[in-house]
Amino acid sequence: KGCDFMEKYRVKPLKPAANMEISVPGSKSITNRALLMAALSDGRVCLKGVLFSDDSRYFLKALEELGFKLQIDEEKKEVTVTGEGGMIPEKSGEIYVGSAGTAARFLTAMLGLSGGTYTIQASEQMKKRPMKALFQALEQLGVHFDYLENEYFLPVRTLGKEAGKNRVTLDISQTSQPLSALLMASVMCNDGISIDITSEKKQGTYIEITRKMMQTFG
């Protein structure tokens, strides 16, 4: 099933006419969102048109380290993920996200809200990138962290989650990825999550992509 969340463009016919086949590359942002949603789904999900990049490979490796069953075919650009209904097979472990911002933020939200104990390592570049908005939001939701080097930066260890906290305020002025991360990972919370966006920026293309993809996944 397709996702109607991208802008539409008018394409003029090629003159003279020619018979050809064009392969359009996938999207890093869409690929990593789809991987997270597939992992949080219940049952097998086959993703087609996957973009294999450093970011998606770090994401795939992390899912394998967390115990998810994957079938990967780079030639066909396909990945099959067996979701565990919002559960993570391994209740503790360590992953490495390299310099992948989407993997870092999406997986941090998932691991934090799971209530397990996980260590999230990253490249020196990723250790300098802003994560404070996401960490503070997760702390409001009862997630406890051990910041291994600098507060509100990777690397970090999740130390479990308090029950009963489901309201959060969030500033997305720097990046909307924390909002996308919370929206997707909210399926792990029995009562859902109530998010109050405090920044002037409240909408954006990537937020809409996340919302439309979540609708597609049901």
Regions found by a protein language model. Give the residues of each.
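Structural preference for solvent-exposed beta-strand-turn elements
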Residues: 5-218
